[in-house]
């Protein structure tokens, strides 16, 4: 069984972290984030590191132990460097453009798809076939990228659609005569 929770989370330079009961708050150059741990997890700030321990040894507490540590590590990385997810668009006539702060996607429908990003997420279109989603909250960045990909996911025959930049599409062979 993994024991990733045993390792304390080091507070990176340039970030101030505070622990108040079950709440960890991190302030950094990119902004401020917090994480509220479950009641079965105890948090302490010792030697510029957050120590995560389960209150008791129940299966439920142990299962939330490693997840809590990873979430705290994620908020530290978010306020220091931020997160980004790159998307690629493949297909004839498929393209993206910014329309104010909204993302306009031409994906082969009879209409253009307009996506309004939530607060705290920035979307950049360096090329008409590339989209970069960035922000400080890892979950929110991944969710926005998944919502954009969902409009026209990649299909296995020609590879047309919106895919993650690091995603490999398993291609299928067409029908034979």
From Swiss-Prot:
Q: What GO biological process terms does the UniProt entry carry, in alphabetical order?
A: cytoplasmic translation
Q: Could you list the residue ranges that cross the membrane?
A: none
Which InterPro entries does the record match to this protein? Ribosomal_uL6-like, Ribosomal_uL6-like_a/b-dom_sf, Ribosomal_uL6_a/b-dom, Ribosomal_uL6_bac-type, Ribosomal_uL6_CS
Could you give one GO CC term from the UniProt record? cytosolic large ribosomal subunit
One of its Pfam families is Ribosomal_L6
A GO molecular-function descriptor: structural constituent of ribosome
Keyword terms, alphabetized: Ribonucleoprotein, Ribosomal protein, RNA-binding, rRNA-binding
| Role description | This protein binds to the 23S rRNA, and is important in its secondary structure. It is located near the subunit interface in the base of the L7/L12 stalk, and near the tRNA binding site of the peptidyltransferase center.
Member of which family? Answer: Belongs to the universal ribosomal protein uL6 family.
HAMAP family cross-referenced by the UniProt entry: Ribosomal_uL6_B
Binding partners and assembly: Part of the 50S ribosomal subunit.
Q: What is this protein called?
A: Large ribosomal subunit protein uL6
Gene transcribed to yield this protein: rplF
């Amino acid at each position: 069984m993994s024991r990733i929770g045993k390792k304390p989370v080091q507070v990176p330079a340039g970030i101030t972290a505070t622990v108040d009961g079950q709440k960890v708050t991190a302030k950094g150059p990119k902004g401020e984030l917090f994480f509220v741990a479950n009641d079965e997890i105890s948090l302490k700030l010792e030697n510029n590191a957050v120590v995560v321990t389960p209150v008791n040894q129940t299966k439920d507490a142990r299962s939330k132990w490693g997840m809590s540590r990873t979430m705290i590590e994620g908020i530290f990385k978010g306020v220091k460097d931020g997160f980004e997810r790159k998307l690629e668009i493949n297909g004839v006539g498929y393209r993206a453009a910014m329309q104010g702060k909204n993302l306009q996607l031409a994906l082969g429908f009879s209409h253009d798809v307009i996506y309004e990003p939530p607060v705290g997420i920035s979307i950049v279109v360096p090329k008409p076939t590339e989209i970069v989603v960035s922000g400080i909250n890892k979950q929110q960045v991944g969710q926005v990228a998944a919502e954009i990909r969902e409009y026209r996911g990649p299909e296995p025959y020609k590879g047309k659609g919106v895919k993650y930049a690091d995603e490999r599409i398993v291609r299928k062979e067409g029908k034979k005569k």
